[in-house]
Each structure stands twice: as C-alpha cells, then as structure tokens.
C-alpha cells in the first residue's frame, strides 16, 4: 500500500475508533450499512497493522483489499455470516456472479449481476427468462456443474447451496481466493427470510429484499398466528410422506426438515417429529397406521412451474392410498391424503404452499385464504412474467385450482 493509502486508512481508523459500535442485525438503512462498514474496516486496519508491524498472525485483509475497502468506504466493506456459519466479507460490489443457487435472482431483480446459472435454473426459465441469456454451467441441486464453464464466467462470486450440490472442496478449492463463495439455501422456512435480507445487503439491493420480506411476512405471520390459536385437542395428526423406501417402508420428515415446519406452521402435529434421528428417516406402514393420522401430507420431487403434467404427483398419491393398511386411517377414509410439489413447497413462493396446506388441514378456519391468488401475486410481483398459475404448472394433487 502506498503512503497515501496508509494515511487514508489511518485517518479512517482514527475516525472510526471514536464512533459508536454498530448493531449485529443485518443492516438495512444507509446509516446501519455505514456503521457496520466502519466497524469492519477499523477491525481490519488494526489486524493488518498488527501483522505488518507486530508479528501478528491473525487473518486480515490483503493490501489490495484494504485499499479497496478504504476507497469504497462507507458503502463497503460489507460482512455477513452465511448459512454454514462462515463469515463473508466483501470490499467492493459483486458484479460477476455465478448463481448455482438462483432462487433469489429474479425476485430481487439482480439479473444483470449474474453471468452463469446452473442447468436447473435454465430449466426454470419459464418464470426466469433471464437464465436463457446466461452461461449454462450445468448441474443444479445435487448434480455437479462444469468447472470449465465456471472459469469461463470469470466470476467474482459464486452463490450456492448449503444442503445441495458440491461442497467447499469443489467451489472453494478449485477457484482463486479472490472468488467469494456464499452458501445459502433459500429453502428452509426457518431461515429463508434472513437469507434474503443478508443477500440483499451483500448485493446492495436492500429495498428489493425488504419488499419480498414484507410480502412473505404478510401471509406467513397471519397463517402462523391463526394456527397457533387452534386448541391442542383440535389439531390434526399428520404423517409427512416424502416417498417410498422399499417394501412397506415410507420415508418421513422429522423436526428440522422444512416439511415439518410447513406442517406445524399450518397447525398440524407431525406424528413422526421425534421418531427419526435425522431430518428424514424410514418408518413402516404398520407404524403409520398405529399413529392413526388425520391427514397424510406427501412431498413429491416433481411438478412446479415448468411442467403441466401431474402424473408424478398423481402416482405418489396412488402409492400412498394403495397401501392397504393405511386405508383404515382417518386420513384415507376422509380423503385427506394430499401431495405437494417440492418446487411449490420450498423456495421463495412457499407462502402460497403454506396457505394451501393450512386450508387443506382446516378449510373452515382458513376459508378466506386463496392460495392460488397468493401464488399469482408472487409471480406477478417478483417475476414479472406472463404466467397464469390457474392454467399452468403442477403444484398439488388433488389439484386445488
């Protein structure tokens, strides 16, 4: 760093040391952003000088990053903790992003910052048409992308999943250290909202993130509050089915899996909440019948906005109702076996799916909810495409439209 760079950094440091400490929540206002930038920059200047002059060995900005951070202050540096718990700090705007996870791109209107997308994002181009103009890096979800295609993008950041796809041994180890790797899912209801606020702050699109969060809270908070008021003795016992596991075994969701959250947020009681050690596990149909569920909520890994073919969801429904031992449960007797597409149940559109589930469970209590209208509002406001959810897409079985 040149002498003028040191002088600028020291001048900033002196000013920052007498400023009040910033709050720990995700910054949303200009003042909060500037306050956090001040705290981070002061910390990094001290760490750099400790390493440079006192033999310190702690992590710190490089000379180039410290110069950029000082130059871009007070809008930068920006710091978040991603969903893996890793601290992410940037010192300049991110403008060349590979979106291996692209759930956030269109709703936050960040298409221009994206250079490459996973093939799964390209397949969803019916509601994300920008994806057709980007480099297809392959992969998506659990499938690995093409590393050469990622190099072709020359990214300054990769935004990927926590629970799906390659780990750091792929994205971090194979990329230059200058490439920021951020891991967020935008899937789990328990932390999707916070992830949107964090990525909005990191990419300087706080207003768009706040707009989505306000829309999300409008529906989710209302459903959860109304469901919480249902007396315990009136709550439906629900078995969550996430597919066959061979023979008479079914795979189910326990506490910590997003379908469990949907079930409980809608007022249901997950009969397998404490039965399996992991987020998902296997139980026998005889055990399911013994729980005598009032409803069965199935998750099908098909459907969504990009197809009009309901066959996979219908087959999943038939697979459950065809289990002879389950025909004696209240769920089967009262026609309360429901299937929801995972492309509807997870992701930023999930408030519409939650409304669907709540209305399935308690049609009288949630008679005023219109899940189809919520889904259409999501498409209109956050994707801005000509797409009629009443005519296209496969979201549930039986089809509630």
Where are these regions (language model features)?
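Alpha-helical, coiled-coil/dimerization segments enriched in small aliphatic residues
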Residues: 251-279
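Structured C-terminal subdomain patch of bacterial secreted/periplasmic proteins
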Residues: 188-201, 210, 214, 221, ...
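Bacterial Sec-exported substrate-binding components of ABC uptake systems
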Residues: 65-105, 207-241, 366-401
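Secretory targeting signatures
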Residues: 1-31, 48, 54, 61
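A short, structured surface patch at a secondary-structure boundary
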Residues: 96-153, 157-168, 268
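Alpha-helical segments with a strong preference for the paired helices of cellulosomal dockerin domains
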Residues: 33-73, 147-152, 169-178, 311, ...
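Short helix-initiation/N-cap motifs at beta->coil->alpha
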Residues: 83-85, 135-148, 276-285
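Extracytoplasmic ligand-binding site segments that recognize negatively charged/polar headgroups
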Residues: 108, 164-170, 184-198, 231-261
């Amino acid at each position: 760093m040149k002498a003028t760079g040191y002088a600028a950094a020291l001048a900033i440091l002196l000013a920052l040391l007498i400023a009040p400490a910033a709050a720990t929540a995700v910054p949303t206002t200009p003042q909060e952003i500037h306050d956090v930038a001040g705290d981070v920059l002061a910390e990094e200047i001290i760490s750099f000088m400790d390493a440079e002059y006192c033999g310190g060995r702690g992590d710190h900005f490089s000379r180039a990053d410290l110069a950029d951070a000082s130059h871009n202050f007070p809008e930068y540096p920006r710091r978040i903790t991603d969903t893996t718990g890793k601290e992410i700090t940037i010192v300049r705007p991110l403008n060349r992003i590979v979106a291996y996870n692209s759930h956030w791109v269109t709703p936050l209107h960040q298409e221009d910052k994206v250079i490459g997308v996973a093939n799964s994002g390209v397949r969803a181009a019916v509601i994300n048409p920008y994806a057709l103009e980007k480099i297809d890096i392959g992969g998506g979800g659990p499938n690995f992308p093409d590393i050469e295609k990622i190099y072709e993008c020359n990214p300054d950041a990769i935004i990927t999943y926590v629970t799906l796809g390659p780990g750091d041994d792929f994205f971090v180890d194979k990329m230059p250290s200058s490439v920021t790797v951020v891991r967020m899912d935008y899937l789990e209801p328990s932390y999707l909202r916070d992830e949107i606020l964090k990525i909005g702050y990191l990419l300087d699109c706080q207003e768009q993130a706040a707009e989505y969060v306000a829309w999300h809270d409008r529906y989710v908070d209302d459903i959860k509050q109304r469901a919480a008021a249902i007396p315990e003795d009136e709550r439906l016992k629900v078995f969550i089915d996430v597919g066959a596991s061979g023979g008479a075994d079914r795979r189910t969701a326990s506490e910590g899996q997003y379908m469990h959250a949907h079930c409980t947020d809608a007022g249901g009681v997950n009969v397998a909440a404490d039965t399996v050690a992991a987020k998902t596990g296997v139980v026998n149909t005889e055990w399911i019948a013994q729980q005598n569920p009032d409803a069965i909520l199935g998750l099908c890994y098909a459907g969504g906005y990009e197809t009009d073919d309901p066959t996979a969801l219908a087959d999943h429904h038939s697979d459950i109702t065809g289990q002879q031992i389950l025909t004696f449960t209240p769920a089967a007797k009262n026609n309360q076996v429901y299937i929801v597409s995972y492309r509807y149940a997870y992701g930023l559109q999930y408030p519409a799916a939650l409304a669907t589930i709540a209305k399935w469970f308690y049609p009288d209590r949630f008679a005023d909810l219109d899940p189809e209208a919520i889904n259409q509002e999501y498409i209109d406001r956050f994707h801005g495409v000509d797409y009629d959810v009443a005519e296209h897409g496969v979201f549930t079985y039986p089809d509630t439209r």
